[in-house]
């Protein structure tokens, strides 16, 4: 299913959830620093770069496209962290790891809407996301669980259902 928004086509899965893709963009393979971008709706808040998938677009391709548009970075797409449901907003987001190899000086959203980007230590990123984007904060917990459960790499990408209302989202 598709719906037209003023500047894009939104795609939905069979359950009516908007199909999205995002990346945890790390400065290096050590995955100690992650890149967050300012929200287009609330420029004083930080978010994980990502957005809606286009018709017929694969999740990994969408994730790479979105981070280039929103964060102005390119890199090596890594593992799928998981597929996260935001029941409140009816989104399903495929979240990947991306190791940044190129940082653009000017990029689409910096020019069009003045979007900013900043590197954060993982704990700091979790803290800034927790109050207004708890679903996104949960990406990092899932990343940690994947490391411990499978010695560094998740074998199967699980689907997580989280409520954006809780201060510490529960994974069901």
Curated annotation (Swiss-Prot):
Give the annotated active site: 69 (proton acceptor)
- Motif span (Nudix box)? 51-72
The residues listed in the UniProt record as binding Mg(2+) 3, with positions renumbered to this chain, are: 66
Keywords in alphabetical order, please.
Acetylation, Cytoplasm, Hydrolase, Magnesium, Metal-binding, Nucleus
InterPro entries cross-referenced by the UniProt entry? DDP-like_NUDIX (IPR047198), NUDIX_hydrolase-like_dom_sf (IPR015797), NUDIX_hydrolase_CS (IPR020084), NUDIX_hydrolase_dom (IPR000086)
**Domain of life, per lineage:** Eukaryota
Checking Pfam families in the record gives: NUDIX (PF00293)
**Keyword Transmembrane helix among record annotations:** no
List of residues that carry N-acetylmethionine = 1
The task this protein performs is described as: Cleaves a beta-phosphate from the diphosphate groups in PP-InsP5 (diphosphoinositol pentakisphosphate) and [PP]2-InsP4 (bisdiphosphoinositol tetrakisphosphate), suggesting that it may play a role in signal transduction. InsP6 (inositol hexakisphosphate) is not a substrate. Also able to catalyze the hydrolysis of dinucleoside oligophosphates, with diadenosine 5',5'''-P1,P6-hexaphosphate (Ap6A) and diadenosine 5',5'''- P1,P5-pentaphosphate (Ap5A) being the preferred substrates. The major reaction products are ADP and p4a from Ap6A and ADP and ATP from Ap5A.
Name this polypeptide is given = Diphosphoinositol polyphosphate phosphohydrolase 1
According to its UniProt entry, this protein's organism is: Bos taurus
């Amino acid at each position: 299913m598709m719906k037209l928004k003023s500047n894009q086509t939104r795609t939905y899965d069979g359950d009516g959830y908007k199909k999205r893709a995002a990346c945890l963009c790390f400065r290096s393979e050590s995955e100690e620093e992650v890149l967050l971008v300012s929200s287009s709706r609330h420029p004083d808040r930080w978010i994980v770069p990502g957005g809606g998938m286009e018709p017929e677009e694969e999740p990994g391709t969408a994730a790479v496209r979105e981070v280039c548009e929103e964060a102005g970075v390119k890199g090596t797409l890594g593992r799928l962290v998981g597929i996260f449901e935001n029941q409140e907003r009816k989104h399903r987001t495929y979240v990947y790891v991306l190791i940044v190899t190129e940082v653009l000086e000017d990029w689409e959203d910096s020019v069009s809407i003045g979007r900013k980007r900043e590197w954060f230590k993982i704990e700091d990123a979790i803290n800034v996301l927790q109050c207004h984007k708890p679903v996104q904060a949960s990406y990092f917990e899932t990343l940690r669980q994947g490391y411990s459960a499978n010695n560094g790499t998740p074998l199967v990408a699980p689907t997580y259902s989280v409520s954006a209302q809780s201060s510490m989202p529960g994974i069901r």
